[in-house]
Amino acid sequence: MHKYQTHWVEHSIVKILSSAGKKYIALMAGGMSAEREVSLVSSEGVSKALIELGYSVTFIDMGADITVRLQEIKPDIVFNCLHGTYGEDGCLPGLLNIMRIPYTHSGMLSSALAFNKIHSRSWFLTNNINMAESIVVNKSDNIKNDPMKRPYVIKPLTQGSSIGVEVIFAEDNFNFADYDFPYGDQVIIEQYIKGRELQVAVLNGKALGVLEIKLLKNRFYDYETKYTEGFADHLCPAPLPANLYEKLLIESEKIYKTMNCKGPARAEFILEEQTNKLYALELNTHPGMTPLSIVPEIAAYAGINFTNLIEEIIKTASFES
């Protein structure tokens, strides 16, 4: 029988599950970003899988005292289950590099590059990855009219899970002069591409498969659609011609490798409805591990169940010297 020991620390409870003979893992989740809840839901499944695999697990709700907590518990590995600011943007990997603690998911520079939409876009274009037309708008520009012909997409520079994303259609009663920049003083304004939403899971450098998202209720793949059952259908494998399916796998591996990622990632694409032209949207280096998340679903299609997926992620844990 496993026994939990509960220790009170600032901002969180750490629960320690003892298990002999396996490495000791700190499961980092929660945190202070807008994606806190998604991170916590992801951590539930990850925790169960780690325990099933026989690891000793400590759950840490990340706060400002994270360095002290890591020094106290001295884990062999940190499983980075954070989403958004501090976990996904390269901050935590940078800290763990300094502390020389192996961690899962991509390193500091890869994470920072993928998380910032301006920098990742430049990287994609440099590597001949096709993207929709876009511009950067600063709050200080005081733009009063539409910055681009409608329809267009407003994207915060450094948010995931479609938080803060808005699609402005021709018929919408929207005045850009009233936009309040809720997630920072810069946004990306991107041409809206009407087409098929395609997602590719990559694990340790290998693309596992392509999934298509069919929207059932909302106008685009927003936060509500991503995390609410019944708002979208997932078609896996995506019903595509073999040559296009293969192209998506190759493009995703190319993006992953040129950005020097490790562990899991998810590449997002749009296949334009009229021209069948493929557009890359982004690479997510911290894909969700919730019951509705895409990477576990594609992995299952590829013959990797959730527990084995977590084991494969653990195998890549390392720090950068």
Curated annotation (Swiss-Prot):
- Binding site residues for Mg(2+) 2: E282, N284
Q: Which residues bind Mg(2+) 1?
A: E268, E282
Could you name the domain of life of the organism this protein comes from? Bacteria
Please tell me where this protein is predominantly located.
cytoplasm
Compartments in which it is found: Cytoplasm
Q: How are cofactors bound according to the entry's free-text note?
A: Binds 2 magnesium or manganese ions per subunit.
What EC numbers are recorded for this enzyme?
A: 6.3.2.4
Q: What catalytic activity does the UniProt entry give for this protein? A: 2 D-alanine + ATP = D-alanyl-D-alanine + ADP + phosphate + H(+)
Query: Which is a GO BP term held by this UniProt record?
Result: peptidoglycan biosynthetic process
Does ATP-binding count among this protein's keywords? yes
Pinpoint the ATP-grasp domain residues. 121-315
- What cellular component terms from Gene Ontology apply here? cytoplasm
Record: residues binding ATP: 147-199
Co-factor(s): Mg(2+); Mn(2+)
Q: Which UniProt keywords apply?
A: ATP-binding, Cell shape, Cell wall biogenesis/degradation, Cytoplasm, Ligase, Magnesium, Manganese, Metal-binding, Nucleotide-binding, Peptidoglycan synthesis
Give the Pfam families listed for this entry: Dala_Dala_lig_C (PF07478), Dala_Dala_lig_N (PF01820)
Q: State the Gene Ontology terms under molecular function.
A: ATP binding; D-alanine-D-alanine ligase activity; metal ion binding
Q: Which pathway is this protein engaged in?
A: Cell wall biogenesis; peptidoglycan biosynthesis
NCBIfam families per the record? D_ala_D_alaTIGR, PRK01372.1
**In which family does this protein belong, per the annotation?**
Belongs to the D-alanine--D-alanine ligase family.
Q: Explain the purpose of this protein.
A: Cell wall formation.
Output this protein's name: D-alanine--D-alanine ligase
Organism name: Rickettsia massiliae (strain Mtu5)
